[in-house]
Amino acid sequence: MIVKNEAAILSRCLDSVCDLMDEIIIVDTGSTDDTKAVAAKYTDRIYDFAWNNDFSAARNFSFSLANMDYIYAPDADEILDEENRKRFLLLKEALLPEIEIVQMKYRTVSEFNTVLNARTEYRPKLFKRVREFEGIDPIHETIRLTPVVFDSDIEILHMPQSMHHKRDFSIFVDAFNREGTFSAKLRSMYAKELLKTGDEKDFA
């Protein structure tokens, strides 16, 4: 998982998942609090990554350090309650090897809900570390490109300390300045962010 200044909440997350994991990898992107000291209670695999306003870059680095067959990617402000811990354990025992991505239900606590994120939604959270390519048609050697996705019944509780719109807008601006445009997904996400938390300057 990737973290920054999560000392106040990291134990809450790791206590809920640590015994479900075969390895725990922490990538710190510049904490100035005791985040790494808290993490050290759970693992000695703690790494530094210079933050560059790119969550994908940090996530990709964390994935590159993994050794197990599957990678679970929680954030520090997420937890699994006891019922969903049991579901996660059952998933580990029954997971078919052809499954490449497991989606889990994602629910944000009401304090930080808005009309736009009040509903529980599926998010990809568990990933096969090494993808195996295979042919799917009897002629012309067509390779399956679409991953095999399983929608599980596991529900993650998202308990943020605050809204992150200032940070997120900064990343949007950097991405636009770097690429000169947004991908279709980022356009959609930016529009949603504007509706939730934007002000006059953001719409200008």
Predicted segments with their positions:
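Catalytic-site signature of metal-activated, phosphate-bearing donor transferases
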Residues: 57-63, 69, 74, 80-203
